[in-house]
Amino acid sequence: MKTLIRPLVVLFVVLTAVTGLAYPAVMTVFGQAVFPSQANGSLIEQNGKVVGSALIGQSFDAPKYFWGRLSATAPMPYNAAGSGGSNLGPLNPSLADQVKARIAALRDAGTDLSKPVPVDLVTASASGLDPEITPAAAAYQVERVAKARNLTPDAVAQLVAANTAGRQFGVLGEPRVNVLKLNLALDAAQAAH
């Protein structure tokens, strides 16, 4: 019996040390050395103060800001601890009601509804925390944001273009706009204006 237990205990201790201590320590040091921003949460600072993360969406509802994808997290929007989608199917009447309410909110904010509304402005993402929207969703909001900030639509469109990231490595994903970075660029441009 002793001959069976001893190797098991040794294996348990060795694997615990390797997988529970050594591997996490090596990965932490590697991450901090090679990818320090990402290892610390891709935090965005303004005037020495953390204002958000490039990886987690935030709620913007003032007309002078670009709005991101809607959050389905509970009990409050953009709650990272409650990440998850609404799980409403495409034929669920509740989803249709939510989309209609979101279109009405866009209309009430002064958005021109003569153009088709990009789907990412009226539906929540799978995680409920998406920090990015499509360039089409950003372009759809240019007129409203320009009017609210007393800027020309061309100036706002240039900021959208400057804050649009292409496909990763030229092939992965789709072009996207980080809403927090764009809104911070808008604030900076208006302060300089």
UniProtKB/Swiss-Prot annotation:
It is found in: Cell inner membrane. The system is composed of three essential subunits: KdpA, KdpB and KdpC. Belongs to the KdpC family. The gene is kdpC. It comes from the Bacteria. NCBIfam families: kdpC, PRK00315.1. GO terms for cellular component: plasma membrane. This is Potassium-transporting ATPase KdpC subunit. The chain crosses the membrane at residues 7-27. Part of the high-affinity ATP-driven potassium transport (or Kdp) system, which catalyzes the hydrolysis of ATP coupled with the electrogenic transport of potassium into the cytoplasm. This subunit acts as a catalytic chaperone that increases the ATP-binding affinity of the ATP-hydrolyzing subunit KdpB by the formation of a transient KdpB/KdpC/ATP ternary complex. Keywords: ATP-binding, Cell inner membrane, Cell membrane, Ion transport, Membrane, Nucleotide-binding, Potassium, Potassium transport, Transmembrane, Transmembrane helix, Transport. It is a single-pass membrane protein. One of its GO terms (molecular function) is P-type potassium transmembrane transporter activity. InterPro entries: KdpC (IPR003820). It comes from Burkholderia orbicola (strain MC0-3). PANTHER family: POTASSIUM-TRANSPORTING ATPASE C CHAIN (PTHR30042), POTASSIUM-TRANSPORTING ATPASE KDPC SUBUNIT (PTHR30042:SF2). Pfam families: KdpC (PF02669).
